[in-house]
């Protein structure tokens, strides 16, 4: 079978080695004669899976001991509600920085629970889309927390700065599309959350990192399965968790550790991004309209100079084993999502195709 490279924004490509192991273990896991999908989440075998996954995840991100790691349902959209329901306490407002589609979605959900103070960080610089630097973000004095999204998958916009707003500002961040792709200083955040389906594992699992002093403040109306304290007190097993997604994510963590960890992923991701953006920038046939300082290394949107060729580009790229390159309906064009599991050879195959396509149709 020819090599297929999946550039989907999520559910996204998974490491081939991980899929092979899961395939081998699917019907007989750990010699039990059953699938990991069939064993009890409270049995000792799965408890070991859960504990190892948390330990490996903590090690990969150097999560401090005063932070809890929760394995949850609900995805990023679930956390759009969970953050205000857990962190507001007796306050009625929170700061939200709008830099793109997902930040705006979080703001829309937060309005059900508080009065967000919204700061529009979007700006145009020399005709290119960009984000104002953090030093220009206008935060309020009475906010329970400040929320932002470091990587906008649809817009292809990244905020790579490390937040430094002082110890009194609780920073909450949606890391769904950039978690584990580069080192981060977890201690600068109060809450970090990430849906698994981009850089962690299969859809269905959400990971939350929360500073322990923020627990115990949930709104009385907060659903139990979104209550950080209840999840923590029950080892993320207040209800039946998505066991297969948890297991497979644990395999991804071990794959990451075996391949140099987050620091090595950071280097490889930089190489992949430079290769792809290099082809775009050195061509009049392709374009990307994001300022270089805010370009995402995970999600690279690009347009063809002649949009009439879009359909042909997608058909021919798919036939060449380059799948899921169609851009989001909001922005159109193309989008290549190049998360950790996308090897450098996959990006090389894409750029070779782009150069050849331009030669034939430019």
UniProtKB/Swiss-Prot annotation:
InterPro entries: Aminotrans_V_dom (IPR000192), Aminotrans_V_PyrdxlP_BS (IPR020578), Pser_aminoTfrase (IPR022278), PyrdxlP-dep_Trfase (IPR015424), PyrdxlP-dep_Trfase_major (IPR015421), PyrdxlP-dep_Trfase_small (IPR015422)
Biological processes per GO annotation: L-serine biosynthetic process; pyridoxine biosynthetic process
Pathway(s): Amino-acid biosynthesis; L-serine biosynthesis; L-serine from 3-phospho-D-glycerate: step 2/3; Cofactor biosynthesis; pyridoxine 5'-phosphate biosynthesis; pyridoxine 5'-phosphate from D-erythrose 4-phosphate: step 3/5
Compartment list: Cytoplasm
Protein's UniProt name: Phosphoserine aminotransferase
Keywords: Amino-acid biosynthesis, Aminotransferase, Cytoplasm, Pyridoxal phosphate, Pyridoxine biosynthesis, Serine biosynthesis, Transferase
Enzyme class, broadest EC rank: transferase
PANTHER family registered for this protein in UniProt: PHOSPHOSERINE AMINOTRANSFERASE
Subunit structure: Homodimer.
EC number: 2.6.1.52
Annotated source species: Escherichia coli O139:H28 (strain E24377A / ETEC)
Tagged with keyword Cytoplasm: yes
Source taxon at top rank: Bacteria
Assigned GO CC terms: cytoplasm
Sample GO molecular function, one term: O-phospho-L-serine:2-oxoglutarate aminotransferase activity
Location, primary (coarse class): cytoplasm
Binding site for pyridoxal 5'-phosphate: 76-77, 102, 153, 174, 197, 239-240
Cofactor: record remark: Binds 1 pyridoxal phosphate per subunit.
């Amino acid at each position: 079978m020819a090599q297929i490279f999946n550039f989907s924004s999520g559910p996204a490509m998974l490491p081939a080695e991980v899929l092979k192991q899961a395939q081998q273990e699917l019907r007989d896991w750990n010699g039990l004669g059953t699938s990991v999908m069939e064993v009890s989440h409270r049995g000792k075998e799965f408890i070991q899976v859960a504990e190892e996954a948390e330990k490996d995840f903590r090690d990969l991100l150097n999560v401090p001991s005063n932070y809890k790691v929760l394995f949850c349902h609900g995805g990023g959209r679930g956390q759009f509600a969970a953050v205000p329901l857990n962190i507001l306490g007796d306050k009625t407002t929170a700061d939200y920085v709008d830099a793109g589609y997902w930040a705006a979605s979080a703001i829309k959900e937060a309005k059900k629970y508080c009065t967000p103070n919204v700061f529009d960080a979007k700006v145009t610089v020399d005709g290119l889309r960009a984000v104002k630097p953090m030093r220009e973000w206008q935060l309020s004095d009475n906010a329970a927390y400040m929320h932002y999204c470091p990587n906008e998958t649809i817009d292809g916009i990244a905020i790579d700065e490390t937040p430094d707003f002082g110890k009194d500002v609780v920073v909450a961040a949606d890391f769904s599309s950039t978690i584990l792709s580069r080192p981060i200083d977890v201690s600068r955040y109060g809450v970090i959350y990430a849906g698994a389906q981009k850089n962690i594992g299969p859809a269905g699992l959400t990971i939350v990192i929360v500073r322990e002093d923020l627990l115990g403040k949930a709104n009385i109306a907060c659903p139990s399965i979104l209550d950080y304290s209840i999840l923590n007190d029950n080892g993320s097993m207040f209800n039946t968790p998505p066991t297969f997604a948890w297991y497979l994510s644990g395999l991804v963590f071990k794959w990451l550790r075996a391949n140099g960890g987050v620091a090595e992923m950071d280097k490889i991701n930089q190489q992949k991004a430079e290769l792809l953006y290099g082809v775009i920038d050195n061509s009049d046939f392709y374009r990307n309209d994001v300022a270089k300082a805010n370009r995402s290394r995970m999600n690279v949107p690009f347009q063809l100079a002649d949009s009439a060729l879009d359909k042909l580009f997608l058909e021919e790229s798919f036939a060449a084993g380059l799948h899921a390159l169609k851009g989001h309906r909001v922005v159109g064009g193309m989008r290549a999502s190049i998360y950790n599991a996308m090897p450098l050879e996959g990006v090389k195959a894409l750029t070779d195709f782009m150069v050849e396509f331009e030669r034939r149709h430019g």
